[in-house]
């Protein structure tokens, strides 16, 4: 909690955080947190686990659910299962489908959690990694490395997320600088600045794709978003970036509640708003960049999921962030399942599926913004 100013006594710091939490939840007393969130959280985790098993079992080669469970369990350390599953099924599940499903889940979790973070930091319900240009900026950074022919890894560490992170940070800095009006961030200017930055990044990415025909397929996957080339390597490469970023965000849920107040009020409560914003924006952008570097630009996950969670479980970021993470993973796993089964044997880019779900929802939210009926 070093972001809390040292001039504020520890007792006042705790009281300040409780005050912000109470204002965020709309309750006068917070210690009991109303009803326990654990049953609902465990239910969401159970739905996520069921989605993983379903998506891993369903495909052109249908595999029974019990066989899928046996195959997964047999690869876990310390568990021995009778080898009664055909080798072909084992290869399909472990080498093809499971890496794809887990990468889709990781990407959905990251995008949803980052979307909730951006919405809290900007105090704007339409902030989203895709809408404010962060995802397209990250895609531009990753594309620049791909077409340059530079090494994609250094001592086992993937460099694509770092390049994507540079593009994401530059994009969010430009959007924030252009859209800010005094101490406020109006919805209209935020969306317009995001559209401008996203359009510019997409134009440069398209130009690089046209100039480098040998890397067209790789860049195409980054632009549209797809998991059809997912591997265990891509999944593990993202973890060193995603896990620390997620830990930072989840541990600062209370401070994100404080940021929902006016900046001057936050300072009076002992919080340094600018340092907190920079930390959370950096963590959210790093996580988004890591996801974009392996999955491409997938829109509207960071918009749909946090709002759905907020409607069901309230705006308290201590609940909103972890629930967005779990629900985002479930949403993108099911979206990817639809993308690869709706038009078999062809496959639809998952970004198209999320756009079909997200655009009507975005228009609905935009209308509510005009009516001032958000939080």
Segments and roles (model prediction):
Residues 2-375:
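Alpha-helical transmembrane segments in inner-membrane proteins
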